[in-house]
Amino acid sequence: MAGGKIPIVGIVACLQPEMGIGFRGGLPWRLPSEMKYFRQVTSLTKDPNKKNALIMGRKTWESIPPKFRPLPNRMNVIISRSFKDDFVHDKERSIVQSNSLANAIMNLESNFKEHLERIYVIGGGEVYSQIFSITDHWLITKINPLDKNATPAMDTFLDAKKLEEVFSEQDPAQLKEFLPPKVELPETDCDQRYSLEEKGYCFEFTLYNRK
C-alpha cells in the first residue's frame, strides 16, 4: 500500500438472514471462538512493523468492560459528537478521541499512514451506517441459531441491501489470503466454508470486497 490510502475494513457479526447486529446496546450471544477471531484479525498484521487502528463509537467503547480497554496492541479510536476536538491522541494508552468519523480517518491518514496497516471499524450501528461509501472490505461473521425456534431478538441491523449493492462476497480462499497468516481459521466444512458450531449457534467467517 505504499503511496495509497490505509485500507478501511468493517468487521461485524450478523444474525442471519436480517443481518441483526445487536439488541439493546449489546449482543445476545457470547461466542469465545468468534471473539478470538476478532481479536486475532484486528491485532495481527502482515507487516510486523505496523499495527491496526480500531474505530468505534462512544457507546461501543463504553460497552467494553473497563479492565479490557483499551483493546491491547491496537490504536483505539473513539468517536463522539460530544468531543470538542477533531483529534486528541493519548500516545501512552494508544487511545484517540475524535468528534467525527471523517476527522478521525483524515488524521489517521495524515499522521499515521506509515505505521498503520488497516483501519477496522467495529461499531456500533450508527457508525457502520456511515462507512459504506468509504469501506474497502467487510469481514462478516454470519451467525445462525441451530434451533430456529430460539432465534434471539434484535433491534439493530446492518443495511443488507446496501451491502449487496456495493460489495460482493468472496470465496474462502480469498478470505484466507486477506487475513494475516497467523490468524487461526477453522477447518473448512464440506462446502469449503470456514464455519464453526458453538453454544447453540453455527457461524461462518466471510469476506466482502467492494465491487
UniProtKB/Swiss-Prot annotation:
GO terms for cellular component: cytoplasm; mitochondrion. Pathway: Cofactor biosynthesis; tetrahydrofolate biosynthesis; 5,6,7,8-tetrahydrofolate from 7,8-dihydrofolate: step 1/1. NADP(+) binds at residues 13, 20-26, 58-60, 80-82, 123-130. It holds the Pfam family DHFR_1. GO terms for molecular function: dihydrofolate reductase activity; mRNA binding; NADP binding. Residues 7-210 form the DHFR domain. GO terms for biological process: dihydrofolate metabolic process; folic acid metabolic process; one-carbon metabolic process; tetrahydrofolate biosynthetic process. It comes from the Eukaryota. Its EC number is 1.5.1.3. Disulfide bonds: none annotated. It catalyses: (6S)-5,6,7,8-tetrahydrofolate + NADP(+) = 7,8-dihydrofolate + NADPH + H(+). Present with 1080 molecules/cell in log phase SD medium. Key enzyme in folate metabolism. Catalyzes an essential reaction for de novo glycine and purine synthesis, and for DNA precursor synthesis. Belongs to the dihydrofolate reductase family. This is Dihydrofolate reductase. It comes from Saccharomyces cerevisiae (strain ATCC 204508 / S288c) (Baker's yeast). The gene is DFR1.
